[in-house]
Amino acid sequence: MAASVDQRPYPGLHNGVVRPLKPGPDIPRPKKLPQAPPPLSDSSSDEEEDTTLNLKDLIRKGTTEVESSIFDPRDDGTSDHWIQRNSSLVRLTGKHPFNSEPPLPRLMHHGFITPVPLHYVRNHGPVPRARWEDWTVEVTGLVTRPTCFTMEQLLHDFPSREFPATLVCAGNRRKEQNMVKQSIGFNWGAAAISTSVWRGVPLRTLLKSCGIYTRTKGALHVCFEGAEDLPGGGGSKYGTSILREVALDPSRDIILAYMQNGEPLSPDHGFPVRMIIPGFIGGRMVKWLKRIIVTTDQSQNYYHYKDNRVLPSHVDAELANAQAWWYKPDYIINELNINSVITTPCHEEILPINSWTTQMPYFIRGYAYSGGGRKVTRVEVTLDGGETWQVCTLDCPEKPNKYGKYWCWCLWSVEVEVLDLLGAREIAVRAWDEALNTQPEKLIWNVMGMMNNCWFRVKTNVCRPHKGEIGIVFEHPTQPGNQSGGWMAKEKHLEKSSESNPTLKKSVSSPFMNTTSKTYTMSEVRRHNNADSAWIIVHGHVYDCTRFLKDHPGGTDSILINAGTDCTEEFEAIHSDKAKQMLEDYRIGELTTTCYNSDSSSSNPSVHGSSDTIPLTPIKEVITPMRSVALNPREKIPCKLISKTSISHDVRLFRFALPSDDLLMGLPVGKHIFLCATVDEKLCMRAYTPTSSVHEVGYFDLVVKVYFKGVHPKFPTGGIMSQHLDSLPIGSVLDVKGPLGHIVYTGRGNFLVHGKPRFATRLAMLAGGTGITPIYQVVRAILKDPEDCTEMHVVYANRTEDDILLKEELDEWAKKYDRLKVWYVIQASIREGWEYSVGFITESILTEHIPNASPDTLALTCGPPPMIQFAVQPNLEKLGYDTQNNLLVF
């Protein structure tokens, strides 16, 4: 709803602009604008030269390290398919229209100036496809000289102003309001804010050149209208208005902007020209500006009345329509209010508590802003619910204009002791401006969910990031859009459960919890940790997954490895929405914390008990005898990266040390492990099969293909875990969990599949890409045993010859051992003399290179699902293989 800064509605096209063409054409705008007169210092600091240099430096610092925008596949089939966008932006309203904000850590990474590709976007419809050469802006209404200006006239015939300004959507932080009660707006997070350097023509200069009438002749309002065709009100442009006094006020720095951060505007941000009204909400800054109309009355546009209002809390949408609240002038939003947000610690950040971290201060950071040009004078942080406040250091590189106005956010930071954080229940922030405005402690709901500026609170809890140490995990109130997470979301979940179950006891108040008639303690859940009774905990709910063991596509181990534990992070990291819906069928009750005790190293005790003391003493590590095997299905084990070798431009060999140099890994042949890492503040878990022998002591090796971002158009961001691994310095520690999988090769042709024995004398082994690694382990195990006579026929498919992993080892084994045959298939040959197949796995290739179907032949496969579904299974069936019983998929 809230019309926000960088975005105005952009539905249809206007004034002869044609419908969008096929994807991929160049954006119809000049890469550089024609030479224009230097900007005036009309209302800037008198130090014009210093200011210009400072702006260039700010732009340079703020726009580095930004990946290229792409034609996002999510825009395919929409009228915006021709626009390149940054793939990291969080989409808030599905595919279309495009409304988005950057991830909060990405926004803050760039500091004071926001790169244009990361600037938040508010669009009501499709983006107009504009051309600089034929775009005009009409000034009409109560003026003596109505004029239609071309872009060249705006550029060359008028002085320009250039200055930094922060744009904020009136809906910034709306999702917090939606957690209390659903508003009529979508879920903006805390990053509906961005700062750019804007350049354009002063509005007052343009109006005076057209001879704006005096107040006595009725010129009381200045209306703005965009180019889009929108559905609101039965069909309209996007339009709004401001008072004449505001429009002509030289201290306001209102401009018709045609440049952002030194470049022409981008399509999402209003190309070729838009309004910039510093200190106002984004909803007044019309993009793709076509008309300026001087009128006696305020704008009659549908969006001027039905958007950007703060109505009293008792007014819902029905009452607002019935009693015409939308048309009451007292509730319109113009200037921004005071606001502040904590950005560091970020959501789900974990701060380990150890001898090193407790000796160092921790920096809490964030941003603050106010409206109307009012300076932010003070930011305070509390760790004790407002009993005491610590004053923050402000970083405000902006200089005021010569009227003393400030148009930009400020960044703030404060040092706190780690041990003080350990004893805190939450961190909260509030800001003050020069008018002594500050933020309310509690949220005040309104039907549009706008101008939310209550204290921003980050919750803290004690966790155990690694065996033997504790840490603090931080939780923001919400995550933007439809993303899950945030302490407010969990509290809302609990509240809904309480409403559906009036018998819920108030003492059961964990924010993770949703209660039914049955509750269980942690100690009860721990007892259900085997194939006879496998319970898990996800977000405080208890699930009995016993009857799903045999049906889990990842095998029984995938459940048993977490049975009897809280596996919320692991479940969220690797399961789809469909899987999450399926899980509800197995829900049997809720976890209660009223009888919680921390008698196990796997528990995550909280310091937020009912007393005022901090019960840290129960957090103890139980010393257990040294194990000869490192892997433990119930625990993650920390493993240190000790070497990294580049095999090719995108293939790496990683060696990780086990927790002790006298340990075996303990991974059965055919099973795999999970690598666990926090990437971009989210838990990432990926399955890998080590390539080192299961008999190696003290370490394991992984051969990993790195999927870099920007290489494959279908996966513009690349592989999350593989890129993370590639970036790790030597000495980094990752968590490993396992063993996982339902297939075990026990030797001499014998397998255990879902715990049931299988036997084969011949194996058809079909691999694709990185799916060679489990096949490789089985091959190694067979060849290592001179009495294992199992025949192996490997068909290994890849895109190119360069993509083939472990080729040297496979070829060497094939030459040395008669019982191993290897055949390669690549999609395209890049050199002459390629002696293997080109194309895809086909019936003819399998006929020639794998054994005939028989009772003592098994097919093993691992690779991309499309390969297995469309190449392996149908072609094996053509050869007479029983794929239901004799095809084993890793």
Curated annotation (Swiss-Prot):
SMART domains reported in the protein's UniProt record: Cyt-b5
Example of a GO biological process term: nitrate assimilation
Keywords associated with the record: Disulfide bond, FAD, Flavoprotein, Heme, Iron, Metal-binding, Molybdenum, NAD, Nitrate assimilation, Oxidoreductase
Residue span(s) of domain Cytochrome b5 heme-binding: 517-592
Reaction(s) the record says it catalyses: nitrite + NAD(+) + H2O = nitrate + NADH + H(+)
GO molecular function terms listed in the Swiss-Prot or TrEMBL record: FAD binding; heme binding; molybdenum ion binding; molybdopterin cofactor binding; nitrate reductase (NADH) activity; nitrate reductase (NADPH) activity
Disordered: annotated segments: 1-51
Record PROSITE patterns: CYTOCHROME_B5_1, CYTOCHROME_B5_2, FAD_FR, MOLYBDOPTERIN_EUK
EC assignment: 1.7.1.1
Subunit structure: Homodimer.
Function: Nitrate reductase is a key enzyme involved in the first step of nitrate assimilation in plants, fungi and bacteria.
Protein name from the UniProt record: Inducible nitrate reductase [NADH] 2
Lyase in keyword set: no
Residues where heme binds: 552, 575
Family: Belongs to the nitrate reductase family.
Pfam families per the UniProt record, alphabetical: Cyt-b5, FAD_binding_6, Mo-co_dimer, NAD_binding_1, Oxidored_molyb
Signal peptide: none
Residue ranges of domain FAD-binding FR-type in the record: 634-746
Family matches, as SUPFAM superfamilies: Cytochrome b5-like heme/steroid binding domain, E set domains, Ferredoxin reductase-like, C-terminal NADP-linked domain, Oxidoreductase molybdopterin-binding domain, Riboflavin synthase domain-like
Binding site for Mo-molybdopterin: 169
Cofactor(s) essential for the protein: FAD; heme; Mo-molybdopterin
